Amino acid sequence: MSVTLHTNVGDIKVEVFCDATPRAAENFLGHCAAGTYNDVKWHRNIKSFMIQTGDPTGTGKGGQSIWGKPFADEIRSSLKFDRRGIVACANAGPDTNKSQFFITYAKQPHLDGKYTIIGKVIDGAEDGGTLDAMEAIPVDAKNRPTSEIRMTGVTVHANPIAIKAAGK
């Protein structure tokens, strides 16, 4: 299962871990399919660490899960922040996942066991790819990009949640 996040900087294709973290995957795919992420800013960008999005208000303080309330973490010991391009739920502490997510720019082992991993980048994390372009964008004192980065749309390549709902 994969989605392509289209941005004004380039595309990022993500493999979603539907079996390993089913609730987080359902929430992420639900937002992708509903257009929640369309025209949303990437509001936090920290070189060598990560870039964050998924807040429809663009402030980093908004967003909601598809169920209208935060959902529990799905921490899996088999999933680690062991490479560039790990996609995970952003949160404000344990069991506070909503619509926001982040993508790592490098290994971040200190995050292991603290954030639910949704998937990994399978296209766009290579040298000279979209993540490089995003990481190179200057930021202000609050790590907000000085040149706007926006999600222009999302392509869901095969949505098992929709297939299940359709009874197929």
Swiss-Prot record:
Family: Belongs to the cyclophilin-type PPIase family. PPIL3 subfamily.
GO biological process, one term: protein folding
Protein name: Peptidyl-prolyl cis-trans isomerase-like 3
Role played: PPIases accelerate the folding of proteins. It catalyzes the cis-trans isomerization of proline imidic peptide bonds in oligopeptides.
Keyword annotations of the record: Isomerase, Rotamase
Record field: catalytic activity: [protein]-peptidylproline (omega=180) = [protein]-peptidylproline (omega=0)
Zinc among keywords: no
A Pfam family annotated for this UniProt entry: Pro_isomerase
